[in-house]
Amino acid sequence: MTVTKIEIPTIDLRGYYEPTSPTSKEEVVAQVRAACLEHGFFQIEGHGVSLEVQRNMLAACKTFFDLPTDQKAELSLYKNTWRRGYEGYGEQTPHHAVLPDQKEAFFVGRDLPEDQIGFLKGPNVWPEQVPTNQFRGPVEEYFEALLKLGHRVMEVLVVGMGHPPSILDSFTGNAAMFLKLLRYPEHTFTDPRVFGSGAHTDYGGLTILLQDPGKHGLEVYHAATEQWIPVPAVEDRFVINLGDMVQRWTDGEYKSNLHRVLNKASGERFAVPAFWHGDLEATNPLNPNDTSGETVQDFIRKKFYRDYSLPLAEEKGTAVAV
């Protein structure tokens, strides 16, 4: 039986933001909408994030993960309640997975003072032994660039749903976003159930993924043909996918799709997903007829605890991780 070859589309955003682009704004909007309807995934070029900022971010990943294990463990995210810091190998098992993920991670969010600690809110933690220009500086610069990119991508999404960009005013004013720096070891495991990241959906708004160029591994499930579609790791190209919140808030029109990672490269593989959720206090901007009053925080909080079998605890009293 012949298997239909499916690819995740690549879209040049310059057609939307640059008047001199040969692609029209309407074409870009239509391409993004089609990808959201079929895959819940698309790749973007012409995004406005400099190649230098991307390369510095990946170099910062290597700098951190090359630290001795005991130094990384000192920054464990289990030592705080707002999900910042280091997560070691095997410490996460996605809801749909059988075995723990074979990866290590480091989480960064908006850097807030301790008197503002709350659900997913608080200060970042940093490795003091690493010079600022080798880690914290590049990470913070990348964070700011991705905050802006998330806003731009969301604008294209809502225009594709027939809404004016202004509908996002309250949603993007103080958008919550989290970086998850990742290192996957070389895949030498013989158990076919072991993955760098097991099959899962993301449960927030947008995910914007930076991949280590040439280090392939991401696969997206295509239900209609029951196949896993490889998404290549190409320099200066981001992978965008929609989370469960977008699927819910569009009444299932836009997809939050299963995906997984199996490191197919020789040697280690780095990746940096940015989870861009919008303002935690904002309600649904994607469906003006939604009268539920559910906020971004309401949705994420429920998924956060349910998917990881954690009790509904007070954030200031119990350390939790996602």
Curated annotation (Swiss-Prot):
Cofactor note (record): Binds 1 Fe(2+) ion per subunit.
Protein origin, superkingdom: Eukaryota
One GO process term, biological-process aspect: small molecule biosynthetic process
Alphabetized Pfam families for the sequence: 2OG-FeII_Oxy, DIOX_N
Conditions for induction: Expression is positively regulated by the cluster-specific transcription factor caaR.
Co-factor(s): Fe(2+)
GO molecular function, one term: oxidoreductase activity
Keywords, comma-separated and alphabetical: Dioxygenase, Iron, Metal-binding, Oxidoreductase
Involved pathway(s): Secondary metabolite biosynthesis
Binding site for Fe cation: H200, D202, H259
Record's function text: 2-oxoglutarate-dependent dioxygenase; part of the gene cluster that produces the acyltetronic acid derivatives carlosic acid, agglomerin F and carlosic acid methyl ether.
Protein family (similarity comment): Belongs to the iron/ascorbate-dependent oxidoreductase family.
The protein, known as: 2-oxoglutarate-dependent dioxygenase caaD
Lineage of producing organism: Eukaryota, Fungi, Dikarya, Ascomycota, Pezizomycotina
Gene of this entry: caaD
